Amino acid sequence: MALLRALLGLLACTPRPSAAYFGLTGNEALTILPLTSEMEEAAVKAHYKVCDRLKLEKKQRRMCRRDPGGAETLMEAISMSALECQYQFRFERWNCTLEGRYRASLLKRGFKETAFLYAISSAGLTHAMAKACSAGRMERCTCDEAPDLENREAWQWGGCGDNLKYSNKFVKEFLGRKPNKDLRARVDFHNNLVGMKVIKAGVETTCKCHGVSGSCTVRTCWRQLSPFHEIGKQLKQKYETSLKVGSTTNEATGEGDISPPKKSIPGHSDQIPRTTDLVYIDDSPSFCLMSRYSPGTSGRKCYKDKNCDSICCGRGHNTQSRVVTRPCQCQVRWCCYVECKQCTQREEVYTCKD
């Protein structure tokens, strides 16, 4: 699969000393590292090796090493973030291209696409860590054991909740503290926090009733995170409404703040960004033609009545006809399988012209 080839490709980014980075915005290779028999036989040594293969900063590597489940959770976060990013942008000119040279160039600029990468990476790590705690894969955390619910006396806290409290603490420490002066570093930090806040806002309480004939005299309740696909959907919406910002100085603290650009720019809002808004510094390129930021859209598959005009950037599209075989007229047979016929049909495939 093209996606797996992208994830298995190695990446070398230029290190940035201003803050800690991870996932789709980090220095590590976008690699899905398999759990081998060697890892099962020598778990501690193996997880140290994985932490070393993820090109982390010194503090991040130490945090990865201190829990046997850390490396697996970090890899899961990277994979989950990459898959969701490519899913959310599958119909866009920039389709979350993660090949090394394109991603490295993109991360050097403060585009709105870069903002999304920071948010989805921090969200992925927050989500993966909270789930790892509740699944018992981490030694330093367990289930969410501190319910703060109304009418607690009527509820029995017996479910295994996702441990967002520990996850937030871990991610904040892992990604580093808020920088004071550099605008780009502050913007990246802000977008990291947006990803974490979307995770927190999506926490739901799930309950199961116990009692005679379903009377629900006792309820077992626990907290669960929203599915990560829902998180990705919300972050994509925030990408669509992201705000361009500049830099100002807070007279009370002397520290820099992010704010709307000093001069009004046509097409951009002067709205002061909220803590839940994605923000960016630089206007994005069109992504129509091959550049340092993307391979362009030449040859990209599109959908005639949906996005060919947009993705192909006015160059038009080619039409090819092909015959495909698909399961059809499926029926459930007792017991217990589905029986289908194989039907052939002709379909048209549309790709962008050069």
Swiss-Prot record:
GO molecular function, one term: cytokine activity
SMART domains: WNT1
Ranges for region Disordered: 246-271
Post-translational modification (record): Palmitoleoylation is required for efficient binding to frizzled receptors. Depalmitoleoylation leads to Wnt signaling pathway inhibition.
Coiled coil spans: none
Example GO biological process: embryonic skeletal joint development
Pfam families: wnt
Residues spanning the signal sequence: 1-15
Lipid-anchored residues (O-palmitoleoyl serine): 213
Principal place of residence: secreted
Glycan attachment sites: 95
One Gene Ontology CC term in the entry: extracellular space
Alphabetically ordered keywords of this record: Developmental protein, Disulfide bond, Extracellular matrix, Glycoprotein, Lipoprotein, Secreted, Signal, Wnt signaling pathway
Disulfide feature: 85-96, 133-141, 143-160, 207-221, 209-216, 288-313, 302-308, 312-352, 328-343, 330-340, 335-336
Protein localization: Secreted, Extracellular space, Extracellular matrix; Secreted
Family: Belongs to the Wnt family.
Function in brief: Ligand for members of the frizzled family of seven transmembrane receptors. Functions in the canonical Wnt/beta-catenin signaling pathway. Plays a role in embryonic chondrocyte maturation and in embryonic bone mineralization.
Database matches in PANTHER family: PROTEIN WNT-9A, WNT RELATED
Protein name per Swiss-Prot or TrEMBL: Protein Wnt-9a
Species whose genome carries this gene: Gallus gallus (Chicken)
